[in-house]
Amino acid sequence: MAHFAKIGVDNTVLNVVALRNINCVDEDGVEKESIGKEYLEQNTGHSAWVQCSANTQDGVHKEGRTPLRGSFPSKGWVYDSTNDIFYNPNAKPYNSWVLNTNTSRWEPPTARPTETDAERAAGKCYKWNETNKAWELISGVGVSGA
């Protein structure tokens, strides 16, 4: 099965559909996005479709193949045509975090430090502080970084 995202005027994913492979292959049996898009346009009347892969997540293909467009989208995600990726705008945890266009994940402006063994033993971990735009070492049971 091939998967295609139905794209709205603001590049928001309206829906994701599965398409039988027979509807998106050429005469040599090679899957082509353009054939799938044409099939969907003719059969739905909607003109904006972008192929996606159910096997791609965070910029990695589960089967070791070439990842397709960052991550498999859901309704409400955004298709970034400049970077050719899908991303979840609602997954952005803090305003200062930026979109990694290789993985389609939101990342902090500075990497999260690794706790030392002593810090972990003391029940400490790093948590993002948006006000200071920095990682802070905090204490507490069951706390975790963002």
Q: Can you describe what each PLM-predicted range is?
A:
Residues 2-146:
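Viral virion structural and adsorption modules
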